[in-house]
Curated annotation (Swiss-Prot):
Its EC number is 1.-.-.-. SUPFAM superfamilies: Cytochrome P450 (SSF48264). One of its GO terms (molecular function) is heme binding. Glycans are attached at residue 115. Belongs to the cytochrome P450 family. The gene is BOA4. Its cofactor is heme. This is Cytochrome P450 monooxygenase BOA4. PROSITE patterns: CYTOCHROME_P450. Pathway: Polyketide biosynthesis.
Length: 495
């Protein structure tokens, strides 16, 4: 029998344990804070955090061959000139890390964002399995695209104004989801809500933590309303995926089981001991959503706005589609490869509207001396001014002019047949990064966007609102985003 005195002793012991734990917790982060050092790197700081695009343009022009510091919110970022690209992409992971930069930028140790095991499983599944299976996935992508347009984008007889980005985001979520989680989950309203808002909530959660003094961030993170939303997304994603994975494991026990070529199976194969962990699988799917949905929607949204602002390109792209893809024909990878004008238009739209102003983002895991003596300190963050490269007159002729078929014409040069494509990376094209950690999903995204653009051009007329110019993109830290309130007019295509 337990007496009240015993309960008091237990309560006191528990209180002492909690107090001791809090002291250890506070001392640990005090030690971390006191041992943090300012970046020891001799380079000019260009601009301020309120307008990073202008800072990058000015820094790129003022320091064409030397590094400069960009005053990004969480920590300064070393912006390296393009001459270092081969050295940077060749550094081993014990010296430099893409994933650690990614995690730090979004305060992953508080948001549980992109842990190493999750990042590895997702990267392998997307870079290897998904890329090799795009041809097989196109049938499902086309079917879901047709259904998404039918349910999300009206087809009125007369001009109708619509707010573009939210519609595109939902359609991309459905089409991507058809490949990532299958049907019917890809059309589940709660799943669409989770996958489309996770990115925003992770960003806001990281920002909210950053706004606090470093000593109080761990405590704030425990009670942050922003991070509570992120944790709820993880819980909800796990609940949705648990029965799907359990069913797959039951099927795998059958003697006649044949592995489906889908993301569920690839994640099982690439997750090691975490294969049956629904929470892990939920985090992985949300990481895919983070990397894919808004970037794909941004590229497609910008292309639609550019087409609406420059209607002369619409008919040219329709003619190219008609010449290579008869009505009621299954889209194939080979057919999409033939749409060179569409590919060029998308790449030019991407050049003029860079979603990521800085790419090749890395964190130095060790101090490295480059070939010219430049020292990159351990713990520093670096990147390259991808958005500014696209406007460099030394690289592109008349860079401030929109030429939708710029890259199609460049591909007509001898030996350039397979260069200058949307998915191509290199010193003059860093939108998707470059090297080992270039965007692994860019091949899938390219095919997805083209499939959706075909559906749009075949069945809709669209234009800017009368008397308006192309809506400007909005600045957001090191990104440019499509204005979520931007509107266009649409109607059923007149044939």
């Amino acid at each position: 029998m337990i007496h009240f005195a015993d309960l008091g002793a237990i309560s006191l012991a528990n209180s002492n344990t909690v107090i001791a734990g809090c002291i250890v917790f506070a001392l640990y982060y005090l030690f971390q804070f006191l041992n943090s050092k300012k970046l020891n790197f001799d380079a000019p700081v260009i601009g301020d955090a309120s307008d990073l695009r202008s800072a990058l343009i000015n820094g790129y022009n003022q320091c064409p061959n030397t590094p400069f510091l960009l005053p990004t919110a969480a920590h300064p970022t070393i912006i390296l000139p393009i001459k270092y690209i081969d050295e940077i992409k060749s550094l081993p992971p014990d010296k430099i890390s893409f994933l650690e930069e990614f995690r730090d930028r979004y305060f992953g140790h508080y948001t549980a964002f992109a842990n190493n095991t999750e990042g590895d499983a997702v990267t392998t599944s997307v870079k290897v399995d998904l890329t090799q299976s795009i041809a097989r996935a196109l049938e499902n992508m086309q079917a879901e695209t047709e259904l998404a347009f039918a349910t999300e984008l009206p087809k009125p007889k007369d001009w109708m104004s619509v707010t573009l980005y939210p519609i595109i985001l939902r359609m991309v979520a459905k089409v991507s989801g058809r490949v990532m989680v299958g049907e019917p989950l890809c059309r589940n309203e709660k799943w669409i809500q989770i996958s489309t808002t996770y990115t925003r909530d992770t960003f806001l959660g990281g920002r909210a933590v950053w706004a606090r003094h470093p000593l109080f961030r761990p405590i704030y993170a425990l009670y942050s309303p922003e991070l509570k939303k992120v944790r709820q997304h993880y819980t909800d994603a796990a609940e949705f995926l648990r029965p799907i994975f359990n069913q797959r494991f039951k099927e795998m026990e059958r003697d006649d089981f044949e592995k489906p070529q889908d993301m569920i199976q690839w994640m099982i194969d690439n997750s090691g001991n975490n294969a049956k962990d629904a929470t892990f699988q939920g985090r992985c799917q949300l990481l895919i959503s983070f990397a894919a949905l808004h970037t794909t929607s941004g590229l497609l949204g910008n292309a639609m706005l550019d087409l609406a602002a420059r209607p002369k390109y619409i008919e040219a792209l329709r003619e190219e589609i008609a010449a290579n893809l008869p009505e009621n024909t299954q889209i194939t990878k080979q057919i999409l490869t033939k749409l060179r004008k569409m590919d060029s238009f998308l790449k030019e739209s991407q050049r003029m509207n860079p979603l990521n102003l800085v790419t090749m983002n890395r964190k130095m895991m060790d101090t490295v001396q480059l070939s010219d003596g430049t020292i990159l300190p351990k713990g520093s963050f670096l990147g390259m001014a991808a958005g500014s490269i696209g406007f460099d007159p030394r690289i592109f002729e008349n860079p401030d002019e929109f030429d939708g078929f710029r890259f199609e014409k460049l591909r007509q040069q001898e030996g350039a047949e397979n260069k200058f494509q949307l998915v191509t990376t290199g010193k003059d094209s860093l939108a998707f990064g470059h090297g080992t950690h270039s965007c692994p999903g860019r091949f899938f995204a390219s095919n997805e966007i083209k499939t959706m653009l075909i559906e749009l051009l075949r069945n809709y007329d669209f234009q800017l609102l009368p008397g308006t110019e192309r809506p400007k993109n909005l600045k957001s830290d090191m990104s440019l985003v499509v204005d979520p309130t931007a509107q266009i007019q649409i109607k059923e295509r007149c044939r």
